[in-house]
């Protein structure tokens, strides 16, 4: 009888420890993803460099234009 009680207590303790470690891992994963997304956004913002347009003829605007594909900072 003591064996079964000890076995049940060990199983309950193991299941409690598993759920605690799983919840810590999930919150850690969310914060890690947020950190990675922030680093990527900062890197993308730093990669935006103005590049001079080709001034082929009269009437062309020689203002710098961003290379970033998402940004629309090229005004015509």
Curated annotation (Swiss-Prot):
The record's principal subcellular location, in a coarse class, is secreted
Signal peptide segment? 1-22
Q: Which GO terms describe its cellular component?
A: extracellular region
Q: Which GO terms describe its molecular function?
A: ion channel regulator activity; toxin activity
Q: Which residues form the propeptide?
A: 23-42
List 4-hydroxyproline occurrences by residue: 50, 58, 62, 64
Q: Does the record carry Secreted as a key word?
A: yes
- What happens to this protein after translation, modification-wise? Contains 2 disulfide bonds that can be either 'C1-C3, C2-C4' or 'C1-C4, C2-C3', since these disulfide connectivities have been observed for conotoxins with cysteine framework V (for examples, see AC P0DQQ7 and AC P81755).
- Localisation: Secreted
Q: Name the source's superkingdom.
A: Eukaryota
Any domain commentary? Answer: The cysteine framework is V (CC-CC).
Query: Briefly, what is this protein's role?
Result: Probable neurotoxin with unknown target. Possibly targets ion channels.
Family from the record: Belongs to the conotoxin T superfamily.
| Name of the protein in question | Conotoxin Cal5a L2
Organism phylogeny: Eukaryota, Metazoa, Spiralia, Lophotrochozoa, Mollusca
